[in-house]
Every structure is written in C-alpha cells, then in structure tokens.
C-alpha cells in the first residue's frame, strides 16, 4: 500500500531539516520531473503553454519554462505576477533569458497548469475561474503540476477545476486526488521525487492507498484444510439484504471458510451462504452489511 497525505508541508520541512535540502533544490527537481515527462511524450518544437500562479506552484512552472525554452515553443502566461520569493527568483531567471508572459493562445499542444498546488484552501476568484474555463476549452494534452487547480485537500473541487490528462504530483500522493469527485479530473498520476527517493521523503501516514499486491488471497498449503480452517464471518443484514449478500460473497472470494448472514427475516440466499437468526458461537469476524 502507498501512503497518502492531506498536505506535504511538514514533509518538505523535514526534507530541509533532515537531508539538508533547500526549497530551491526541491523546486528544481519538481521542474525536472515535469520537463522529463514532456520530453518523453512530445516531439521537439511542440507548443507548450505554461500557466503559472504567483506562489511556489507557479514557480515550478516558471522553472519548467526555463528548462524547455530552447527545445520547445514555450508560451508563458503569468496572470497574477510573482509573489513568493522563489517565484520572484525564477521570474528573474526568465527575464534574463528574454522570456516574458504572453496572452493565452487559442490552442497549444500541451497545457501545463501550475496555478495552485495542494495547499489551495480558498474559493477561486472570478479571474482564476475565467482562466480555468479557457484552459479547459483548449484541445491540447493537459498536465497538472502537483494537483489540478481547483482541487482541495479534502477531495472536494470547484466546478471549474482544471481537467488534467496527467497529474505530476510532487513528493508524495495527496489524499484529495483519490476522492470520488476527483476521479475525472486528475487523469494519470505520477509521483515526482524532490531530490531524495520518496521512501526517504515520506513518513508513516494514517491514510493509505491499497494496491493489488495488498489483496493477496490466503495461501492454502495444508492438505487437510477444510472450510472450518479459514474462519467464520458473520454479516449483519440491514433492512435490505442486498449489501449483506454482496459482502458475504466477497468474503468467500477473499478466502473466508464460512460465511453466515444474520437476519430476523428469512432472506433468500445463494447456496454458499448460510442464514442465522443469532450469532454463531464459532464466529471469528463480524461485519455490517448495510
């Protein structure tokens, strides 16, 4: 299973303190991860629209523009200026290269959203909404830097959230990207390392993403094993039995030896499930199928 985080501010601070990284080093690696993905997927000379916010997520985008400017047709759009120290530094570097902010084009091969990262906590203002509407209307391949702008840490999202084909999230997976609401706007998800491998960057989390390897069925190697060897699951039925029947069938498929549904009614069941009006004495696990 993989760790999920509501935000990674504390992980960034830990990387600075424990591994002597700097915010600028981590930002450069974030930009390199974006650059590498674009170089792997798009031919040289493609038009790359990079839309940057005024903070550090925008600074990632500014650094990306610097890395791509010689090989691609980079179109930089910086609607709100640069406010964070690192954004100002990245903008100074672009100024030295002669790269200036331009108006939004009518189209581009690639659209990079670097407006807001996972720290967004306020409603989107009308100016931002207008920009996101314009970006979503473009036909190019859409990449979100860290998270799609408009997606909040709790997994809720603004109606105008950037609809990405690919999200390159920085450092670690964010919990909000796996909410039901986010499924249609994050696209493919790639985690970018920020100067150290993610196993060093991460710390234990109370939130996890299950993987197929976590769902291994019991290994039945004993020749004398029988249905009583692998536990007895009791599932309490609600007013409607459908959920309990589905849970019971899933329990058997996952390896439970016996499954009994508890109900005050005589519920019709598949032959492999048992029905009882009281809790069996040999129950080893209880679930609510409601």
Enumerate the language-model features and the residues they cover.
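Small-residue (G/A/S/T)-rich helix-start motifs and N-terminal tracts that mark the onset
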Residues: 1-71, 75-78, 166, 177-290
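Short, ordered loop/turn segments at secondary-structure junctions
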Residues: 79-81, 147-148, 172, 264-266
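Short secondary-structure transition/capping segments
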Residues: 88-89, 155-156, 270-272
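Short gly/ser/thr-rich secondary-structure transition/capping motifs
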Residues: 94-100, 148-153, 214-219, 272-274
């Amino acid at each position: 299973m993989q760790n999920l985080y509501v935000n990674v501010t504390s992980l960034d601070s830990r990387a600075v303190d424990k591994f002597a990284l700097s915010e600028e080093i981590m930002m450069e690696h974030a930009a390199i991860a974006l650059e590498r993905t674009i170089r792997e997927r798009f031919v040289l000379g493609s038009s790359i629209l990079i839309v940057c916010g005024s903070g550090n997520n925008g600074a990632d985008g500014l650094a990306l523009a610097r890395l791509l400017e010689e090989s691609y047709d980079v179109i930089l759009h910086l609607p709100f200026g640069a406010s964070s120290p690192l954004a100002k530094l990245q903008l100074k570097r672009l100024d030295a290269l002669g790269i200036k902010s331009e108006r939004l084009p009518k189209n581009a091969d690639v659209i990079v959203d670097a407006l807001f990262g996972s720290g967004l906590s306020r409603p989107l203002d009308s100016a931002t909404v207008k920009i996101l509407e314009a970006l979503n209307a473009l036909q190019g391949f859409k990449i979100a830097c860290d998270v799609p702008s408009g997606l909040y840490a709790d997994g809720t999202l603004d109606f105008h959230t950037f609809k990405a084909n690919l999200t390159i999230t920085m450092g670690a997976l964010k919990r909000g990207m796996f909410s039901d609401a986010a499924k249609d706007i994050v696209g493919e998800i790639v985690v970018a390392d920020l100067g150290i491998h993610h196993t060093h960057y991460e710390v234990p989390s109370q939130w996890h993403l299950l993987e197929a390897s976590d769902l291994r069925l019991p290994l039945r190697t004993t020749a004398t094993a029988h249905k009583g060897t692998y536990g007895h699951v009791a599932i309490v039925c609600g007013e409607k039995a459908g959920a309990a029947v589905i849970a019971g069938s899933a329990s058997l498929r996952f390896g439970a030896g016996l499954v009994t549904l508890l109900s005050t009614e005589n519920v019709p069941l598949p032959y492999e499930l048992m029905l009882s009006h009281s809790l069996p004495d040999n129950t080893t696990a209880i679930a609510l199928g409601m």
